[in-house]
Structure formats: C-alpha cells, structure tokens
Amino acid sequence: MACMKLGSKSDAFQRQGQAWFCTTGLPSDIVVEVGEMSFHLHKFPLLSRSGVMERRIAEASKEGDDKCLIEISDLPGGDKTFELVAKFCYGVKLELTASNVVYLRCAAEHLEMTEEHGEGNLISQTETFFNQVVLKSWKDSIKALHSCDEVLEYADELNITKKCIESLAMRASTDPNLFGWPVVEHGGPMQSPGGSVLWNGISTGARPKHTSSDWWYEDASMLSFPLFKRLITVMESRGIREDIIAGSLTYYTRKHLPGLKRRRGGPESSGRFSTPLGSGNVLSEEEQKNLLEEIQELLRMQKGLVPTKFFVDMLRIAKILKASPDCIANLEKRIGMQLDQAALEDLVMPSFSHTMETLYDVDSVQRILDHFLGTDQIMPGGVGSPCSSVDDGNLIGSPQSITPMTAVAKLIDGYLAEVAPDVNLKLPKFQALAASIPEYARLLDDGLYRAIDIYLKHHPWLAETERENLCRLLDCQKLSLEACTHAAQNERLPLRIIVQVLFFEQLQLRTSVAGCFLVSDNLDGGSRQLRSGGYVGGPNEGGGGGGGWATAVRENQVLKVGMDSMRMRVCELEKECSNMRQEIEKLGKTTKGGGSASNGVGSKTWENVSKKLGFGFKLKSHQMCSAQEGSVSKSNNENVKIEKLKDVKERRGKHKKASSISSER
C-alpha cells in the first residue's frame, strides 16, 4: 500500500488513559476534547495551522482563562483523526495512507487548514496524495472508498466518493490483461518462459497470467451496499457486460446473506473466487431483507443471466425474512422464465405459511409454472408456439422448441412424485399442477403414472370417482411396456384404467408380434435364396457366404425366441381380458335385474363398455392383425409348395438324363 511521509520530528505524544499529552517540556495551555478523548496541547501550533482553532482560541482568550477548553464534537474521523491532525500541526512524523487520507482530508476541510494558515498545509498535502497516488491504484481506491462510509456526507461534498467510484469503474471496464493489473497489485504470479522477471520496475519479458473478468468481485464486496450500488450503477453506464454485473451482484449477495451460503462451490461460482469469504459485520434481519429486495431490483429481467439456483435460494430467504409480496412475486417470475434450467431439489421448498397446510410450497411452484407457460407463449418461437403440435401421438416441431417444455414436464412429474406422500396435499392442488403441463410435452407418461400411484398409495381414503378423475390425466398409449405391466397389476387404480391399460398393452404386443412375423418371413426367404443360389458377390463384398448365412440364422433364432415370448404374453393378456369381460358381463346382468342374460346380451354389454372406454377400433385392429397373420401363414405354405415342385422337377430331370445314357449304351 502506497504511503506519503509528513513531518520530521520524533513522536512526542504519550497517552495516559483517555488523555494525550505532548511532552515537549512546555506546560500545556489548551485542552481539546474530541468525543471521550482529551488532548493537552499548546495553542500556537494549532492556531498557526487551523482557521477554526484560531477563532476558538481567540474566543476562549477573551474570557480570561489561562488554560482554555475547546470541545469538538463533530470532527470527521473522531479522536483518532484529531490525533493525526495534532501531530501534523507539531511537525511530528506521520504517514498518509489510503486508509486515513479521506478522514484527514475531511478533517482538514472541517478545521479550515488551508494555505492561508501555512504553506503545505494539510488540505493541499492530502489532496495531492489522494489524486496522484490513491486514484492511480485499484487497491488504494477501494480502501479509500471503503473509508468514506463513516464520513460520507463530507466525502460527497468534496467529491471524494465520486472520484473513487469513477476510478474503480474505469479500471473494471478495462481489460486487465492489456496493462498487467490488477495481477501485479494483487501479488499474482508471473509467467516467464525465459526465466526473466520484473527488475527495478522494468519488464524484462515476464507476462502476467490471464485474469478472469471477476477479479474485482471480492474487493467490491467489502463495500457497504449504498457505495456498492453506486459503483455498479457507474459500471453499467460505462458499458460493462451484463453477465459481469450480475455476477458481482450474486457474489455480493452470497457474502452478506448467510442463508445463501448453504451451497458452496456450485456451478454459479466461477473464476478464482470459488466461495465468498465471510464478512465481519453480520447484518440484522431487517438489513438482510432490505438488501435482498434491493439486489432483486438491480438484477436484469433476462433469462440465463443468473443461475436458477440463486433465484431459488433468494426466494427461500425472502419467505423466511418475510420480504414484500412484490419481491416474492418477481423472484417467482424470474424462476419461471428459466424453469427448464432448474433441478428437482430447487423446487422442493418447504412451506413457510403460518397455517402449514402442506409440507411443501406447492402454490409457489404452481405460480412458477404458470409464469413459465405464460412466458413461453409470449416469446416468439417458444415451445408453446403453434409450430409445435402433436400428430398421432408423435411430436412435430424443431428439437430446439420441444426441449425446454419436455424438460419442464419431466421436472414437474418428478416434483409431483416428491410431494405426493404429503397426506395434507389436497387432490385439487395435485391435479391442477399435473394438468398444467400440455399433453404434447410428455413423451411418456411413466413419470406422471409414478406420481399418481404414490399419491393414491398415501391417500387411500379417496373415493372411486376422485381416483377416476385423477387417473384421467394419464394417456395409456404413452405408457411404456414396464409401466403397463405394473399398472395392470396395480390394485390402487380404478377398474376403468386397468382395462384401458390391458387393451393398449395387448394392442402393442399384437402389433409387435405381427411385425416380427413379417421380419421373420423376409429372413426365411433370404436364407432360402442363400441355400439355393449360394453367395453372390465379389471377393471384396461382405465377409463371405458362410458369415452371411450364420448371421441370418442367428438373427432368425433370436426373433423366434422373441416371438414365442410375445405369444405367451398375448395369451396371458387374452385370458385376463376374457376374465374381465366376464366380470363386466356379470355387472351388466346385475344392473338389469339379476336375471340370466344370454351371450348376446353379454357381448352387447361388453361392446357398450368398450365404446365408453374408447375401444371402438379394437375389432378393426384385431382383424388387421389376424389378416396379417393369415397372409404370413399363406405365404409360408406357398413357399413350401414351390420348393416341393422344384425338388420333383430336379428328380425327373436326373431320371431322364440317366435313362438317355443307358439307351445310348
């Protein structure tokens, strides 16, 4: 730290308790009281340097007191600063530094220590040191600005605060790698390929290491928030990038709000400052609340500028500190703008409501999701734009537009599964949150099915109608085979949903089996061609006839094993469907009076139930699969007949050839 030495005399001041004495051999003729400290000094050194002291001593002398008493209660810097002022008046050695120059400059102005009362007076000395030394250094400017807090009114009047902020903003807006600072100021290491170093202030080839854009975060976080806010405002006016400004705001917030330090070393930490250092002054709850609200207003409303985790932490602290409703609403809106970048742990927030109706703050998550959906509809080319649609269960649209909504759908499904065990969570809240996600956003409904199953498990008292209404959110066509298998055996699901699941699972299996038959038939035809015609192709094509034949045989065997397992599964499902059909027929008989109904009535009841469940196309699909299987078997029989005819023709040809040879003999 730079300094400037003043005076040449040895220190003649001694402290005894709450009093300072000047041991020059002459008795003291004036007592100056500054706060709780008293200074026993001499009149001449003081009045020869200060206009205020000259007037006060003259007024005291008129009263005829031999030893006058002067009280100074509003001196900038207090008794510590007056000690340095007194030493300057006596010509005692002292050092001007970046830490005390602001106090001395303000005190000199207050005491009117101008050039009229002595050449090289304290005002000119401090002004020269401040302008020519302090403002030329980042570190010294930070220390000087930090000291302005206690004398802010005087510092503003003398433009000291403004000069410090302008100097800091200028250096922060300039690429530090162009000039070698602030690495040199911070004592950073040097790169020297040839082993050269800095010698006598002259660079001999050494280069400072590359400095990241966040090098000033820690120094700026030492300032009080009013000064920090003024510094950030000037930096923005100088064109510093918004992401750098946002990074400094998040760093400052994490340092001064203890509740935000629970996640250390997260992805939001960057550069050489992995975690903010602790602050010596702990803010009160009211000060923390005010700081949080101020920071929230300073941050730009721009997606991706600040990590979502930071906003989630701020929202949690805002609810603990009971911040204003506007602050909480803005934080929820910010999270909603970039909800696709959030993690599941970010949304699992405890409820801080006085009523404590639920364990988790589901209402806040609902509002966040609504903000995301609303922002998505407004933004051009968003995931909710008309260009994204669903056609026959397949998503149509660019991957860039589908990805955010799909990620949010997966996130909300995970959140629903997380909060489902809460017995206090009402069905309307759970159902409303699940229904907020558009249908096209879920590629599979497995996550939603899992959440509903957990909710039904922990809410066994729900009525059958409530269960059916909740399960209507499921699209059975979007369930995977594993989910269908689990749902078919799930006793918590309504009967209507189980029938739908079994039907669609059977339909999927029939389609898969039919496809396997077609593939197997094609492979059988190819293998027969290989057996009849041998390997056709050049020496460089493929890997030989034997390798191709073996591969085809292996694939055919694998497909046959798969078809066998599918046939068994289809048979099991058909048995289950027939059993359920009988049960439904019995239900239909009982509703009609309990009489014995004919098979026609039972089948008619089943058809009615199928229509209600949306199974109108079942027969058509079944006929299609049966026709497909019939065509496959028919083609197989025709192939067998053709092979037999070929064998008969070959035998006849061989017999004719043998008979002709014998006749010639």
Curated annotation (Swiss-Prot):
Any single Gene Ontology cellular-component annotation: plasma membrane
Annotated Polar residues bias: 271-280, 626-639
Origin: domain of life: Eukaryota
Record Gene3D superfamilies: Potassium Channel Kv1.1, Chain A
Compositionally biased intervals (Basic and acidic residues): 640-650
Residue segments, region Disordered: 260-280, 626-665
Domain NPH3: 214-508
Keywords: Coiled coil, Phosphoprotein, Ubl conjugation pathway
Pathway, per record: Protein modification; protein ubiquitination
UniProt modified residues of type Phosphotyrosine: Y449
UniProt domain BTB: residue ranges: 28-98
UniProt key word Phosphoprotein: yes
Coiled-coil annotated residue ranges, if any: 281-306
Chain positions with Phosphoserine modification: S279
Gene Ontology annotations of biological process type: protein ubiquitination
Similarity-based family: Belongs to the NPH3 family.
Job description of the protein: May act as a substrate-specific adapter of an E3 ubiquitin-protein ligase complex (CUL3-RBX1-BTB) which mediates the ubiquitination and subsequent proteasomal degradation of target proteins.
Domain text: The BTB/POZ domain mediates the interaction with some component of ubiquitin ligase complexes.
Protein name per the record: BTB/POZ domain-containing protein At1g30440
Organism name: Arabidopsis thaliana
